[in-house]
Amino acid sequence: ITGTYLRLSRLLIAIVTYFLTPTFLLLMEYPQWIPKGFEFIAVRDTVYIPLIWQLLLLELAIDGLKLAAVNTPNMLSTPLSVMAALVLGEFSVKSGWFNSEVMLYMAFVAVANYTQNSLELGYALKFMRIINLVLTAIFGVWGYVGGIVILAVSLLFNRTVSSRSYLYPLVPFHGKQLGHQLFRTRLPAARK
């Protein structure tokens, strides 16, 4: 049960990580689309820097903090990176560079990237998210939809090392294999 829960939560977090910031940007451009009861997600403070630039700068800043943590001696890396993130985050919100909502969503995305199995998968999601952000900022709804289409086409037509689609076992559909991918099963008992 625990293994299945972790697999499903990892998949859900990957999906949320991809959609969170582009959807937020789209809803800030079209605030009338924010569902009732979710008005709290709207940016209330004055926006000095356009939201797209805030999101892109924070994507870059998060990578800068990761690189700084990698190049810092082990004993100092965790406390130093936490302190840097707190101080820089607090200063950037108080000075008006970034809005607190943007900082919150990007903090979630940054932490959620560590839930993926591999570093490459985390960066693949990041690059596709950035493409979707830029397309949404330029073309609005059509850019948002276009970013999703680009992701779907990339997943469908790029091949893994085993020459299967990244969407396998969904495309082509293989029900038993899909069950194994989503739900962790017990290993067969050792034969005597």
What are these regions (language model features)?
Residues 1-51, 121, 162-189:
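Cytosolic regulatory modules rich in charged/polar residues
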Residues 13-29, 45-120, 124-125, 130-136:
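Transmembrane alpha-helix detector for multi-pass membrane proteins
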Residues 100-102, 107-192:
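Hydrophobic alpha-helical transmembrane segments of membrane transport and translocation systems
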